Amino acid sequence: MDVRPYLPADRDACLAVFDSNAPDFFKSHERRDFEGFLDRGAVPYFVMEHDGAIIGCGGYFVTEQKAVARLVWGMVRRDWRRQGLGRFLLLFRLRQITKAGGVEMVHLDTSPDSASFFQSQGFKLARVAKDGYAPGLDRVEMTMKLTVCP
């Protein structure tokens, strides 16, 4: 399993990963948001590859408060889920955030179906916004205090 920085040539493969998770984890209107995010390329974003095929992607950014990072657009292709790859990608991003230095708290938002995964990795529920993504799809906001062991 390799993880590397996203390149514009990865766009279609990342959109295919997104599409494999719709409509269960993403609603159709979110695809435009994801396309715009990929096209802007404004934050650290990574792709996970297996034998040259992109099977996952995810990124983060450090907020203006500097001590807070936010995980964004993390996903694993549907046919590769339930194999520990979501955890692998999450830990990779947390290591990148740690390397950036100065970050004390990590925030994310996710769907209710994925919230238990993040809770199992140490994230705490901050709040639930009913219909926050779309009618019938709540937005779950979660946080984790980032601790670095010497």
Short names for language-model regions:
Residues L7, T63, R77, S111:
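Residue-level recognition of the GNAT/N-acetyltransferase active site
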Residues M1-C14:
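A short beta-loop-alpha structural element at the N-terminal edge
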Residues M105-D109, Q119, K124-E141:
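Conserved catalytic-core motifs of GNAT/GCN5-like acyltransferases
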Residues V76, R82-R95:
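Conserved acetyl-CoA-binding loop-helix of GNAT-fold acetyltransferases
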Residues V47, A53-V62, V68-M75:
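Conserved beta-strand in the GNAT
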Residues V43, G102-M105:
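Short, high-confidence coil segments that cap the C-terminus of an alpha-helix
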Residues D24-H50:
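Active-site rim helix/loop that mediates acceptor-substrate recognition in acyltransferases
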